[in-house]
Amino acid sequence: MAKTLYEKLFDAHVVYEAAGETPILYINRHLIHEVTSPQAFDGLRVAGRQVRQIGKTFGTMDHSISTQVRDVNKLEGQAKIQVLELAKNCEANGISLFDMQTKEQGIVHVMGPEQGLTLPGMTIVCGDSHTATHGAFGALAFGIGTSEVEHVLATQTLKQARAKSMKVEVRGKVNPGITAKDIVLAIIGKTTMAGGTGHVVEFCGEAIRDLSMEGRMTVCNMAIEFGAKAGLVAPDETTFAYLKGRPHAPKGKDWDDAVEYWKTLKSDDDAVFDSVVVLEAKDIAPQVTWGTNPGQVIGIDQVVPNPQEMADPVTKASAEKALAYIGLDANTDMKNIPVDQVFIGSCTNSRIEDLRAAAAVMKGRKKADNVKRVLVVPGSGLVKEQAEKEGLDKIFIEAGAEWRNPGCSMCLGMNDDRLGEWERCASTSNRNFEGRQGRNGRTHLVSPAMAAAAAMFGKFVDIRHVELN
């Protein structure tokens, strides 16, 4: 029987499935961080249980840490408690931890692939919704809750119901200036933020194949933003080239054997998907969100939609509420919207490719006077090291940006990088919900190049018409 890639991955990891019951999956890799793991470890202690597979669990610090200092003693309140608890729990259980004093530390969804912890064919979980990022490697990766974190620590398994399969095909090649972020925002704009609910999505088509691994990670990262359980890209030579030589990737004959297996990880030609979505790559423009969910997005060459022209009453009401919060009027030209802050970072767009794209825009330019702050936050210590080797940090600083240490930073209001009330931000992150970047902050999701251009020109501009250096 023909199978989709998702069905192959799921079936290969079923440990036990009784009639009428939810299957139990084996978990190959468990990634943990300081926010969703403390209660899970407490649960183990109370029950008198041990971590079952310490060699399959890896920790890092990212969500609540400061990107300004590397000293845990400089952290305050809950952030300090969370970081200290993670360090204590990892040490007590023999779990490998990439802490703030190591260059390998970083955002969990940047660190994992960098270290070769993310490999095709695996099941990967983490107490974070954007675990879907790792699906770019042909791994079944999804976020879990804290009680499930405890369950995986104790058993290395998880109960999981089968999802439906969705294929999203992006046909043809994108035009110059169009990035992975624009592709995935266009997908979300077409499907709406609930279009993938109940599905695992496989991204395919020439435009997806043309992407680097960094770009594929950006696309899979935001699968969750249209309701999907996980996102997938079938592994290919681009995948293998990225992984070869990584610290935790197979070596020697094990590598050769692994690649032979990984080449089988693709949907069968006659596999049946429950849902299919098709986009033409040539029609995708640089994207900017105008509302308060990622599905409220349009091309930079368009105007803010008019809720009065929306036939569906729920969509209309949502748009009216979003515009009231975001402070925009219907029919406003997207290129006439000034910004107060710019954030380049997050698990969506903080890899070296993203920083190079931003630097190409910012080189030889200065931050616009109306822009209060520009934060550039690398996704890991290794990304930071590479960027500094290439001189990108100097470009950012000379342009008037702040060059920070690795961490989740202003993606979410959980640390000391936040928007002020009613400030408007061009952000390379993945969510533009109300208050996501700080109380009453206004977030517009864009690509790194678009964010950098907004910083330099003080408003959203069409990156296709900006000279790159």
Swiss-Prot record:
Organism listed in the record: Actinobacillus pleuropneumoniae serotype 7 (strain AP76)
Functional summary from the UniProt entry: Catalyzes the isomerization between 2-isopropylmalate and 3-isopropylmalate, via the formation of 2-isopropylmaleate.
InterPro entries: 3-IsopropMal_deHydase_lsu, Acnase/IPM_dHydase_lsu_aba_1/3, Acoase/IPM_deHydtase_lsu_aba, Aconitase_4Fe-4S_BS, Aconitase_4Fe-4S_dom, IPM_dehydratase_rel_enz, IPMI_cat
Record-listed E.C. numbers: 4.2.1.33
GO biological process, one term: L-leucine biosynthetic process
Cofactor binding remark: Binds 1 [4Fe-4S] cluster per subunit.
Subunit annotation: Heterodimer of LeuC and LeuD.
PROSITE patterns: ACONITASE_1 (PS00450), ACONITASE_2 (PS01244)
Keyword terms of this UniProt record: 4Fe-4S, Amino-acid biosynthesis, Branched-chain amino acid biosynthesis, Iron, Iron-sulfur, Leucine biosynthesis, Lyase, Metal-binding
Protein name: 3-isopropylmalate dehydratase large subunit
Family in the record: Belongs to the aconitase/IPM isomerase family. LeuC type 1 subfamily.
Known catalytic reactions: (2R,3S)-3-isopropylmalate = (2S)-2-isopropylmalate
Binding site for [4Fe-4S] cluster: C347, C408, C411
